[in-house]
């Protein structure tokens, strides 16, 4: 793992700012921007139902039960105060990736969410691309394969956002406090 120096953190913030502004680039999601890789500690994201680069089972999509999949992640580095989980469609037709799920203020002792955690009412969730504060499963147009980034961020400070935060609001919080990240990318085709 690589420590986060102040200089690398400045580079991270600059890269994240450009992305959040919606500038078109091949790397539009929060965790895949190359500016984010330098300086952040690496974390591992896993799931008993998802594998890197493999199809998402229909149960976790708009074609199935549309429930959030179970996810696990490695603990963040010393100084982590909470986690943020983001699920984005990197291949969306929008100028920025379609936000499928945002969960924030996850306590530092948490390193997993069970299946259908979005429906429990126990999570602080942000607005997805449909304007709802919950998980919404993959639903690409027929004939298209999309890549879904399941991303975890460790923060060194608490987020004070209320439920229903937007992507830009959460992005600002990540710019201020992200010290580690991890992701798992899975696909879905209709």
Model region roles, listed by residue range:
Residues 2-12:
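Bacterial N-terminal signal peptides that target proteins for export
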Residues 3-4, 16, 24-26:
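Intrinsically disordered, low-complexity segments enriched in Ser/Pro/Gly/Ala and basic residues
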Residues 11-21:
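Bacterial N-terminal signal peptides
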Residues 23-190:
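N-terminus-centered regions that define maturation/targeting leaders and the start
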